[in-house]
C-alpha cells in the first residue's frame, strides 16, 4: 500500500504564482480522508509544496472573498480557516494573516506559510520580495526565501527557432552547444574574424527576409527587409511600457516630417495581447494601430518608418520574429519586471538589447558586459 506519511520523499508540487494555491487545502483534505491527522497533514504538505512568485503585481497575488470560496469549495473553507488560525500562532502581524479583516483569503500568504520554499525569478526580483513586497514574511521565514532566475530552453529558442544560425555556429564551434550552452563561449574566438561576422550577418539578413515574407502572407503588411527591425514582443501591460515605445515612434514621425531623417530606415514591430478586461492596454493597441495607418498613408514617412502590430501573437509568431530581430526592446518600468524571458530569447538569436536595469536584464548585463547591452534609466 501507499505510505502517505512519506509523500514528500517521492513527490514535489510546484505552485507557480497564486493560481494553483488551492492545492494546499485540497491535499490536506485528501490526506485527512486517508486517516492522517491535520497537524501531520500540514507538515507533509509543507514539505511537499514549493511556491514561486513570478510577479509583484497585485493582480497576480490573488485574494478571494470568503463568500466566493464558501460557495465554490465549501469543503475547503474549514481547512483554510484552520490554516489561518495556525498561521496566527506564528505571528501577531495582521498583515501576514491568510484571512484578513475584510474576509478576503490571501492565496500568496497561504502559499508562503505552508510551503517549504518561496523563490523569486531573478536576483533583483528576489531582493525586492525580501526587502519590500514580502518583507514581513522574510523576517518570519528567512530560511524559505531563495532565488531561481528564470531560463529558456535552447532547444526551442535556438535549435528549432533559428536553424540557419544553429548550422553556422556548428560549422565553427562544433555541436557541443546543443547539450551544453556554455560551449557557445567558444564563439568568442571569432569576435574579430571578418569571415565569420559576415556569415552571421548573412544569416540575420536571410531571417529578416523570411519574416518580411511571413508578415506579408499573414498580416498583409509589406516591410523593408533592409531596415532595422526593432521588436517589442511581450504581453501588453502599462509597466512593460509599449506606450513609451509608441511615444518614441510618434516623435520619430514628427522628426521625419521636419526633414530630420534617421541614419537607417526603421521597422518597429509589436507582438502582444491584452487581457480581456484591460481597457488601457486595449487603448494602447488602438493607438499603435492608428499610428501604423497614419504612417502607411504618408509616403514621405513610410520610406523611413513603419509600425507593425502582429495580430494573434503566439509562440508560432515569436519563432518568426525572434531570429529576425536587430534591436530587442526590454524597457519595463524598473523594479516591476520580475525576470522576463524574451530578453534571453532575443539576445540568444543575436539581437542587441535596449533595456532598463530590471528583471533578468541585470544578470544579462553582468554576463555579457555593459558594453554589449544598452541600458538606460535608473
Predicted regions and their residues:
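Catalytic binding pocket for nucleotide-activated donors in carbohydrate/polymer assembly enzymes
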Residues: 136-187, 323-324, 331-378
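Flexible loop/turn segments at secondary-structure boundaries
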Residues: 18-24, 49-59, 125-128, 154-157, ...
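Extended, charge-enriched "interface" segments that sit outside catalytic cores
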Residues: 161-229
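Secondary-structure transition/capping motifs at alpha-helix termini
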Residues: 2-8, 31-43, 55, 59, ...
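Polar, glycine-rich mid-to-C-terminal structural blocks
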Residues: 64-119, 123, 127
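Glycine- and acidic
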Residues: 4-15, 24-32, 62, 66, ...
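Long, K/E/R/D-enriched contiguous segments that form extended
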Residues: 49, 56, 205-318
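Catalytic or ion-translocation cores adjacent to nucleophile or general acid/base/metal-coordination motifs
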Residues: 32-78, 340-378
Amino acid at each position: 500500500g501507499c505510505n502517505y506519511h512519506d509523500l514528500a520523499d517521492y513527490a514535489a508540487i510546484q505552485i507557480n504564482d497564486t493560481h494553483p494555491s488551492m492545492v494546499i487545502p485540497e491535499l490536506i483534505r485528501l490526506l485527512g480522508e486517508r486517516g492522517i491527522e491535520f497537524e501531520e497533514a500540514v507538515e507533509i504538505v509543507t514539505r511537499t509544496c514549493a511556491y514561486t512568485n513570478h510577479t509583484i503585481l497585485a493582480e497576480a497575488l490573488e485574494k478571494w472573498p470568503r463568500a466566493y470560496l464558501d460557495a465554490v469549495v465549501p469543503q475547503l473553507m474549514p481547512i483554510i480557516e484552520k490554516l489561518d488560525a495556525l498561521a496566527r500562532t506564528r505571528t501577531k502581524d495582521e498583515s501576514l494573516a491568510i484571512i484578513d479583516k475584510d474576509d478576503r483569503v490571501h492565496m500568496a500568504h497561504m502559499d508562503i506559510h505552508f510551503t517549504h520554499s518561496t523563490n523569486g525569478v531573478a536576483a533583483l526580483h528576489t531582493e525586492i520580495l525580501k526587502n519590500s513586497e514580502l518583507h514581513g514574511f522574510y523576517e518570519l521565514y528567512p530560511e524559505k526565501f531563495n532565488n531561481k532566475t528564470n531560463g529558456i530552453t535552447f532547444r526551442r529558442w535556438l535549435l528549432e527557432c533559428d536553424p540557419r544560425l544553429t548550422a553556422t555556429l556548428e560549422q565553427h564551434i562544433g555541436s557541443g552547444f546543443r547539450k551544453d550552452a556554455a560551449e557557445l563561449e567558444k564563439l568568442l574566438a571569432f569576435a574579430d574574424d571578418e569571415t565569420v561576422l559576415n556569415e552571421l550577418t548573412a544569416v540575420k539578413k536571410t531571417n529578416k527576409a523570411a519574416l518580411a515574407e511571413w508578415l506579408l502572407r499573414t498580416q498583409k503588411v509589406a516591410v523593408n527587409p533592409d531596415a532595422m527591425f526593432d521588436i517589442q514582443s511581450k504581453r501588453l501591460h502599462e509597466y512593460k511600457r509599449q506606450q513609451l515605445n509608441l511615444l518614441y515612434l510618434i516623435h520619430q514621425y514628427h522628426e521625419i516630417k521636419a526633414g530630420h531623417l534617421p541614419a537607417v530606415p526603421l521597422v518597429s514591430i509589436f507582438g502582444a495581447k491584452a487581457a480581456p478586461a484591460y481597457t488601457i492596454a486595449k487603448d494602447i493597441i488602438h493607438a499603435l494601430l492608428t499610428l501604423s495607418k497614419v504612417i502607411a498613408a504618408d509616403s514621405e514617412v513610410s520610406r523611413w518608418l513603419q509600425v507593425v502590430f502582429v495580430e494573434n501573437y503566439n509562440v508560432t509568431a515569436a519563432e518568426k520574429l525572434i531570429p529576425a530581430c536587430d534591436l530587442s526592446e526590454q524597457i519595463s518600468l524598473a523594479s516591476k519586471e520580475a525576470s522576463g524571458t524574451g530578453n534571453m530569447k532575443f539576445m540568444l538569436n543575436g539581437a542587441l538589447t535596449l533595456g532598463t536595469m530590471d528583471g533578468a536584464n541585470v544578470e544579462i548585463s553582468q554576463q555579457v558586459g555593459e558594453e554589449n547591452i544598452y541600458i538606460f534609466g535608473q
